[in-house]
Amino acid sequence: MTCRGSPLAPLLLFSLHGVAASLEVSESPGSVQVARGQTAVLPCTFTTSAALINLNVIWMVIPLSNANQPEQVILYQGGQMFDGAPRFHGRVGFTGTMPATNVSIFINNTQLSDTGTYQCLVNNLPDRGGRNIGVTGLTVLVPPSAPHCQIQGSQDIGSDVILLCSSEEGIPRPTYLWEKLDNTLKLPPTATQDQVQGTVTIRNISALSSGLYQCVASNAIGTSTCLLDLQVISPQPRSIGLIAGAIGTGAVIIIFCIALILGAFFYWRSKNKEEEEEEIPNEIREDDLPPKCSSSAKAFHMEISSSENNTLTSSNTYNSRYWSSNPKAHRNTESFGHFGDLRQSFSLHSGNASVPAIYANGSHLAPAPHKTLVVTANRGSSLPAVSRSNGSVSRKARPPPVPSLHTHSYTVSQATLERIGAVPVMVPAQSRAGSLV
């Protein structure tokens, strides 16, 4: 069977030509994993029936850290290569000589930031149609960095402690394994381990918990370790000196407090005593009245009251008529003046009466001259004197004393006062404040 002359021949030839002229990008083998710092190869191949004169290849990357900002890795167009993003300069190139149907690229000295999704876009005119995009994932693996180990909690015996282990870097995320570096390489029975978080909790630690512990951080491409020394602290007995010092300090504090309380008490007591002494009034005592004189003699009674000066004076005054020629002196007047318990006087006047002077003891004496016995208790004021003469009482104002050339004052002796019947009395004293004591 031949197709010559058949009207279907041109259509069949066009259909075959269209199939042969289509471009197809091969599927990628999947994700590529590479350790940091090594070279990664990203494959991309295609098929085409057209010449590679107009070949156009673009490699793009969608970074894992920022999927919204795709970046150009490398470009081949018109028989020339062009660099993409600045961070790929000098590290990226095609694995084969261009132009070719194998447009795979390599990335030297891979970095963690190179991780992402890479796309290969191929165009070769006049071929059209078909799938012209290839997708390849790149994962840059990072081994665990040196982990940091530490102890959390008190290391005193009986306490709970947590051993921590963590690495700052590691892709994929590392796992952590704790072990005790002894003969058994096993953790204490009371320990609980979390390999994902990298922690070990040891409860109720004892002396057997002490030792060297190791943490191993590992992932798909590497491992790293750290060591930790756990030393459980046993309770130390307190020294005798420390106990004695504490007791001595407490005793000093107690003695000081007692002394302070006693001092405050005595101060309060003395202060209250002074206030009580100031509030108690002075006691005033009065003397009893003198004993009564016998009926056969005239009584001579003298009272003295308190005054500002509290003075007791006696005077014996006489005048020139004492030496008169009259041999007889009669007692014709008896005067007794009581001046508000302040002044008393007893006087004998010479006269024509023949009655001799009689004293309290009943003896008769010779006619006496004119004598006056004055007992005064001075006050600031002068009041009228009360006198008694011949049974009549009269109040006269005492004239002021007039100095006389014939008047003399002298002190009466104790014997003279006793002879005339004077009675001794106690004179109250006076304080500076004016109150009697």
UniProtKB/Swiss-Prot annotation:
What is known about its processing and modification?
Answer: N-glycosylated.
Give the transmembrane ranges.
Answer: 242-262
Give the Pfam families listed for this entry.
Ig_3, V-set
Q: Which domain of life is it from?
A: Eukaryota
Q: Where in the cell is it found?
A: Cell membrane
Which Gene3D superfamilies does the entry link to? Answer: Immunoglobulins
PTM-bearing positions, type Omega-N-methylarginine? R379
Q: How does it sit in the membrane?
A: Single-pass type I membrane protein
Read off the SMART domains from this record. IG (SM00409), IGc2 (SM00408), IGv (SM00406)
Keywords of this entry: Cell adhesion, Cell membrane, Disulfide bond, Glycoprotein, Growth regulation, Immunoglobulin domain, Membrane, Methylation, Receptor, Repeat, Signal, Transmembrane, Transmembrane helix
InterPro entries membership: Ig-like_dom (IPR007110), Ig-like_dom_sf (IPR036179), Ig-like_fold (IPR013783), Ig_sub (IPR003599), Ig_sub2 (IPR003598), Ig_V-set (IPR013106), IGSF11 (IPR042758)
* GO CC term, one of those recorded: plasma membrane
**Summary of the function given for this chain in its UniProt record:** Functions as a cell adhesion molecule through homophilic interaction. Stimulates cell growth.
User: What is this protein's name?
Assistant: Immunoglobulin superfamily member 11
Which species does this protein come from? Bos taurus (Bovine)
